[in-house]
């Protein structure tokens, strides 16, 4: 019992215990306030246990320097007051940094549904816009006050502990007892850092790793088991390789066949193919105008035509009956900048930290927009096109583009994202009316209203906010009434855009392409097939409508990807083109049989990749390990059905890995001279 009277032992154990209690409390806050999981979720308690072991590891790492300073034989926290003040300063800084990471992590998860990782660094590139969006969306002052108060409270508690232990009279402890306590302490610290005590291989002890939290196969449950500070560190320390040329060569024959490469060359890794003017081009005296309308943060789960029961999108629903309506359209990766990239370049942005738009070496991409010869080209955005450096991609890739952004508009700015979508459409109409009638144009309109802070502008042409309850909207996928009304506003503005186009005289000879850039955070989507929520497909599954007065309405059930847009529209418009990117004209037969679309299901340093068809999803780790096949029509979609469908499993396994590795190469190979 004499050993338990040790001042240093009591201080070390007590300090680690206090910090561990803080981290455990923050984990409870995450589970209750942010995870969105009911407390009876399968595997939740086991995952919490993993998370608490990560918390103990972090607590030990934070306090280890002070424990060492207390344990030194002569100059230590007991004998040197200056050293004690230095230790207190360290505690203030360390706890403040940890607290800040947790705050950012909570916001990051609430916004994107992903724990903080190295990809968060991309927001630092647009710090001013990110800061303004946070300021307009969250109670920053209250959050800051709570953060500082929590840091002050825990530092005060640790200082009190210090006085209650280190300032006590020195007990008499024998040398052997002291040595035994020291040895036990070292072993305990090592076990805490290791994170496990069962099933240890003493010759090769494997520590608890972030991947252990994903044992359930459910990313939402796994998020409960991660420690944001440790996970951020894990993702930052891994080098970001650009591409694996060996893997590209290994899968080249299958991918060249998939793309329909005219002259396959495994040595040069040639992906180029050419398409002539097709007989199915739309008839007209001159080539049609093309209008791309990117629908900010709009997933299929929010659209009535895809099953949303609250009728939030009557205009898009009506258009769906008058257009090519795509039931299974996917963006390859979530994130607006990544969607802009793929929609222009035709190459999925599979970078693992920053967005491809932020790499100055690759922003000058080949794009099929340049195949629309004789067209005036416009890109219109209500805010600042410097956001995520997309202006570099637009200006360097699209020849002769006229880029209009926040500084060019006369309309008032409504929030951090610039002018309203309706004002963007109205001012854009004036620009498009000015194009000579005998000259076609290509216009890319990027909307932003369906985004936090979900501003409803005062000048909105009669839009009315719906009087619905939080329970109603949460039962249909929205997380708040504000989010639901933002979707309604976006749809209302699309209806106004079509009226504006008809009044402006540029509707009749135009192809309109409406597509979502990614889904936003959802609550629950019982109106969708279970696979979309349980397999994480709801993030990538977005609406797509292709509308033209001369285009016969059609429902397309096959899986189609974002990279397919430009080749498909070029075929409709009668444009011959040369393509070395990933997309394909969907009116051409798919060489692989049932169409396959490559996906990134979970971003970050260790992404999970997938290949999706109309009926199946194959998912695997980024290195090809742990492949599983899932039936999208099943009521239990997490079940691996690879044994029931061995041929499809084999086909998709090669295509999924090959398409992902080829896309990584194409980011660099598609650069223009």
Predicted regions and their residues:
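Short coil/turn linker and secondary-structure boundary residues
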Residues: 39, 125-126, 227, 241-243, ...
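Transmembrane and membrane-interface helices of multi-pass
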Residues: 1-242
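The feature marks either
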Residues: 218, 225, 233-276
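Generic detector of well-ordered alpha-helical segments enriched in charged/polar residues
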Residues: 46-49, 69, 84-87, 131, ...
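Solvent-exposed soluble domains appended to multi-pass membrane proteins
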Residues: 262-673
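Short alpha-helical "patches" and their helix-cap loops
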Residues: 81-82, 243-253, 356-360, 583-584
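Residues that form generic nucleotide/phosphate-binding pockets
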Residues: 51, 55, 133, 156, ...
């Amino acid at each position: 019992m004499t050993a338990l009277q040790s001042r240093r032992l009591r201080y070390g154990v007590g300090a680690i215990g206090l910090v561990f209690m803080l981290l455990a409390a923050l984990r409870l806050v995450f589970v209750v306030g942010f995870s969105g999981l009911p407390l009876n979720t399968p595997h939740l308690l086991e995952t919490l246990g993993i998370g608490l072991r990560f918390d103990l590891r972090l607590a030990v790492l934070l306090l280890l320097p002070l424990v060492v300073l207390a344990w030194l034989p002569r100059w230590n926290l007991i004998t040197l007051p200056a050293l004690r003040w230095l230790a207190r300063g360290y505690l203030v800084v360390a706890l403040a940094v940890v607290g800040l990471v947790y705050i950012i992590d909570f916001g990051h998860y609430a916004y994107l549904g992903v724990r903080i990782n190295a990809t968060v660094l991309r927001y630092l590139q647009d710090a001013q816009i990110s800061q303004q969006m946070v300021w307009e969306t969250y109670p920053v002052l209250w959050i800051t006050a709570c953060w500082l108060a929590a840091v002050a409270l825990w530092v005060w508690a640790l200082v009190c502990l210090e006085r209650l232990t280190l300032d006590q009279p020195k007990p008499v402890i024998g040398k052997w007892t002291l040595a035994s306590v020291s040895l036990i302490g070292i072993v305990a610290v090592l076990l805490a850092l290791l994170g496990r005590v069962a099933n240890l291989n003493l010759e090769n002890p494997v520590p608890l790793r972030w991947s252990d939290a994903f044992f359930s196969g459910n990313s939402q449950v796994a998020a409960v088991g991660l420690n944001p500070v440790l996970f951020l560190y894990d993702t930052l320390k891994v080098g970001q390789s650009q591409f694996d040329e060996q893997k590209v060569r290994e899968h080249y024959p299958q991918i060249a066949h998939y793309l329909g490469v005219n002259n396959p060359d495994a040595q040069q890794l040639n992906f180029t193919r050419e398409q002539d003017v097709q007989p199915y081009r739309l008839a007209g005296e001159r080539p049609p105008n093309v209008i791309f309308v990117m629908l900010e943060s709009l997933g299929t789960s929010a659209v009535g035509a895809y099953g949303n029961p609250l009728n939030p999108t009557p205009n898009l629903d009506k258009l769906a009956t008058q257009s090519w309506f795509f039931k299974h359209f996917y963006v390859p990766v979530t994130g607006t900048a990544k969607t802009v990239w793929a929609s222009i370049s035709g190459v999925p942005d599979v970078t693992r930290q920053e967005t491809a738009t932020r790499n100055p070496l690759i922003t000058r991409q080949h794009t099929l927009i340049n195949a629309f010869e004789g067209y005036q080209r416009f890109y219109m955005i209500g805010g600042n096109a410097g956001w995520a450096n997309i202006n570099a991609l637009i200006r360097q890739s699209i020849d002769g583009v006229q880029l209009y952004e926040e500084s060019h508009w006369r309309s008032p700015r409504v929030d951090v994202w610039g002018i309203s979508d309706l004002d963007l459409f109205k001012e854009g109409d004036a620009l498009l009316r000015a194009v000579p009638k005998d000259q076609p144009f290509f216009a890319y309109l990027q909307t932003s209203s369906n985004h936090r802070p979900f501003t409803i502008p005062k000048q909105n042409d009669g839009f009315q906010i719906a009087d619905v309850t939080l329970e109603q909207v949460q039962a249909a996928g929205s997380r708040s009434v504000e989010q639901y009304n933002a979707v309604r506003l976006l749809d209302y503005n699309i209806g106004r855009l079509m009226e504006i186009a008809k009044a402006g005289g540029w509707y009749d000879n135009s192809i309109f392409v409406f597509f979502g850039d990614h889904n936003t955070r959802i609550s629950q989507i019982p109106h969708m097939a279970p696979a979309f929520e349980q397999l994480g497909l709801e993030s990538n599954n977005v609406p797509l409508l292709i509308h033209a007065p001369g285009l016969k309405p059609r429902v397309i059930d096959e899986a189609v990807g974002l990279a397919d847009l430009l080749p498909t529209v070029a075929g409709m418009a009668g444009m011959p083109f040369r393509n070395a990117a990933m997309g394909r004209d969907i009116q051409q037969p798919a060489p692989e049989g049932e169409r396959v679309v490559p996906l990134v299901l979970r971003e970050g340093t260790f992404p999970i990749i997938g290949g999706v068809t109309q009926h199946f999803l194959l998912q695997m780790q980024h290195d090809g390990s742990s492949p599983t096949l899932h039936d999208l029509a099943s009521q239990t979609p997490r079940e691996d059905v690879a044994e029931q469908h061995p041929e499809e499993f084999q086909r998709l396994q090669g295509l999924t890995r090959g398409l992902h590795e080829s896309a990584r190469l194409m980011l660099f190979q598609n650069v223009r001279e």
